[in-house]
């Protein structure tokens, strides 16, 4: 089994759709738009437009044996109104124009537990570093602190274990089960 990660560019749109799995058939699913503001008719259309217009790719695609297996959005934090405007996050984050953010780590069901999330986070760190980021942050779920087993959709932002395995460290918590994780890219 080989895991490769590539930039999510406009020509790879069919692979983006495939990476989203069953959610890919619903244009009103999140489509990695939860923390953005847009004026498109659907979230799917908004992501498509982003890929079409992006000078720097806004996401990465993971492939397992050449099949689309996962997606992550990795962009400058300042471009995410839902992150910058979040009061809980404002209390723990510094003002850093060169900080980037991983909003989601989506992995198709059949590829979970194979290291796809780690591969996406490793590639996200390289992508952010290559584009001038000083730090890369994320807000995963600490599944050990949950009272019940979460649904897969509740883990869209990744897990604490996944971020730790990729070399991120905890800088704060906004809730007992929600650490803010950081990788310094210096």
Which positions does each model-derived feature cover?
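Conserved acetyl-CoA-binding loop-helix of GNAT-fold acetyltransferases
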Residues: 102-107, 113-130
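Active-site beta-strand termini and strand-to-loop segments that position acidic
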Residues: 63-65, 183-186
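Conserved acyl-donor/pantetheine-binding loop and adjacent beta-alpha core of acyl/acetyltransferases
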Residues: 54, 63, 68-105, 112, ...
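Short hydrophobic/aromatic beta-strand or adjacent loop that forms the aromatic wall/cage
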Residues: 57, 176-181
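Active-site rim helix/loop that mediates acceptor-substrate recognition in acyltransferases
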Residues: 30-59
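Conserved active-site alpha-helix within GNAT-family acetyltransferase domains
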Residues: 129-134, 142-172
């Amino acid at each position: 089994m080989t895991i490769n990660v590539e930039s999510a560019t406009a020509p790879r749109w069919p692979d983006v759709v495939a990476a989203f799995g069953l959610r890919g058939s619903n244009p009103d699913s999140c489509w990695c738009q939860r923390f953005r503001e847009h004026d498109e008719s659907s979230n799917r259309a908004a992501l498509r437009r982003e890929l079409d217009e992006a000078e720097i790719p806004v996401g990465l695609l993971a492939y397992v044996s050449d099949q689309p297996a996962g997606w992550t959005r990795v962009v400058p934090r300042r471009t995410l109104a839902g992150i910058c405007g979040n009061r809980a996050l404002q209390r723990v984050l510094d003002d850093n124009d060169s900080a980037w953010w991983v909003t989601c780590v989506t992995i198709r069901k059949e590829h979970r537990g194979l290291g796809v999330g780690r591969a996406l986070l490793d590639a996200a760190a390289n992508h952010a570093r290559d584009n001038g980021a000083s730090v890369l942050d994320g807000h995963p779920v600490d599944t050990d602190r949950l009272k019940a087993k979460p649904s897969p959709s509740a883990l869209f932002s990744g897990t604490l274990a996944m971020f730790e395995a990729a070399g991120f460290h905890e800088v704060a918590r906004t809730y007992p089960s929600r650490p803010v994780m950081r990788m310094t890219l210096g």
